[in-house]
Amino acid sequence: MRTCLVVDDSRVIRKVARRILEDIGYEIAESADGVEAMAWCRAAMPDAILLDWNMPAMSGIEFLRGLRAEPGGEAPVVVFCTVESDLAHIREALEAGADEYIMKPFDGDIIAAKLAEAGL
């Protein structure tokens, strides 16, 4: 079974994302910030990461840059899922190594399509 790490400081968003991803066949882990997510990835690199931008301790973009520098960190498909909708944020995320970028609010069809487009 494929694994997805949902990284968002909102428990509600994590719960909604968990339900959507479990319905399409993913095993889910959750992290509330980038620091916790990095520790999780070092212990067990997931197949995919659904990532928020604005979080305490370490932002999503800081996490992504750190992840891509880790051994095996190039492997997970990273989908930013955030309220940041301007072109500068999208460009920065893609240049840092994000595979896809979606805006909140999101639904199951969008998440499934973006993961499929990224090869999962």
Go through the PLM ranges and name each one:
Residues 15-23:
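Charged docking surfaces used in two-component/phosphorelay signaling
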Residues 44-50:
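Active-site beta3 strand of CheY-like receiver
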